[in-house]
């Protein structure tokens, strides 16, 4: 995926297979998103985009590193059974977006670490 592709998808807005987060503030909430994607047909989580407005708020280099690590931790610790998340970084004006691709799970049903 490149900058042009992701910008076009952002302009189309959130849909069931694509969700936006400005930042990863709530590990439980993100875990629930990953569970939903895994139980459905997969999906994409884009970090660095305001979910209400679709406006891009790029991440700094340090934020990209933290976000990537956080996503990996959530996928392995907050989702049962654990899932793999394919993460890529897309450069945009002023920084980067983290794009996490979650495949449809093969070990359904998935749930969060609280059993929900």
Residue spans of the language-model regions?
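Conserved N-terminal catalytic/coupling substructures associated with nucleotide/phosphate chemistry
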Residues: 1-116
């Amino acid at each position: 995926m490149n900058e042009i592709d992701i910008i076009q998808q952002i302009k189309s807005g959130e849909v069931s297979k694509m969700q936006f987060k400005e930042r990863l503030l709530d590990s439980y909430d993100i875990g629930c998103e990953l569970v939903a994607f895994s139980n459905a047909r997969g999906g994409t989580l884009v970090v660095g985009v305001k979910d209400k407005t679709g406006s891009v708020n790029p991440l700094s280099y340090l934020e990209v590193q933290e976000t990537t690590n956080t996503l990996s931790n959530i996928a392995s610790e907050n989702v049962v059974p654990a899932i793999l998340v394919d993460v890529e970084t897309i450069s945009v004006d002023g920084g980067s977006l983290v794009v996490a691709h979650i495949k449809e799970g093969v070990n359904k049903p998935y749930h969060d670490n609280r059993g929900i």
